[in-house]
């Protein structure tokens, strides 16, 4: 398979994720779209690494996945806390930061 096809797929996944972040108001859906964007960037990194024969981009993709896993833990904890206090996962309700 041509490496350009992987790059096209990466652009498509990133576009879907960006449109989800911009159009949706649910925090969980927005969070999943951000993760989709990170995976699209990882796919592009791995594709470029494969095209040029270097392992540097694959290491960057691996560390990005590690950071994304940590982000999932912290992000879901914040979303669950907001959901418990506000009874809604809407981003519009999260701008009220009073305790």
Curated annotation (Swiss-Prot):
Membrane topology annotation: Multi-pass membrane protein
Membrane-spanning parts: 3-23, 28-48, 59-79
Class in the EC hierarchy, top level: translocase
EC id: 7.1.1.-
Keyword Transmembrane helix appears in the UniProt entry: yes
BP GO annotations: ATP synthesis coupled electron transport
Subcellular location: Cell membrane
Keyword field: Cell membrane, Membrane, NAD, Quinone, Translocase, Transmembrane, Transmembrane helix, Transport
Recorded catalytic activity of this chain's protein: a quinone + NADH + 5 H(+)(in) = a quinol + NAD(+) + 4 H(+)(out)
Superkingdom in the source lineage: Bacteria
Primary role: NDH-1 shuttles electrons from NADH, via FMN and iron-sulfur (Fe-S) centers, to quinones in the respiratory chain. The immediate electron acceptor for the enzyme in this species is believed to be a menaquinone. Couples the redox reaction to proton translocation (for every two electrons transferred, four hydrogen ions are translocated across the cytoplasmic membrane), and thus conserves the redox energy in a proton gradient.
Cited PANTHER family: NADH DEHYDROGENASE SUBUNIT 4L-RELATED (PTHR11434:SF21), NADH-UBIQUINONE OXIDOREDUCTASE SUBUNIT ND4L (PTHR11434)
Subunit structure, interactors included: NDH-1 is composed of 14 different subunits. Subunits NuoA, H, J, K, L, M, N constitute the membrane sector of the complex.
Family listed: Belongs to the complex I subunit 4L family.
Stated name of the protein: NADH-quinone oxidoreductase subunit K
Source organism phylogeny: Bacteria, Bacillati, Actinomycetota, Actinomycetes, Mycobacteriales
Gene: nuoK
């Amino acid at each position: 398979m041509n490496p350009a096809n992987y790059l096209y797929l990466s652009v498509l996944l990133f576009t879907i994720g960006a449109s989800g972040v911009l159009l949706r108001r649910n925090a969980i859906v927005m969070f999943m779209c951000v993760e989709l964007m990170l995976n699209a960037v990882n796919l592009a990194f791995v594709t470029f690494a494969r095209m040029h024969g270097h392992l540097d981009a694959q290491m960057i993709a691996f560390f990005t996945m590690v950071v994304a896993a940590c982000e999932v833990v912290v992000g879901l904890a914040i979303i669950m806390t907001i959901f418990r206090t506000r009874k809604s996962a809407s981003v519009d309700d999260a701008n009220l930061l009073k305790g």
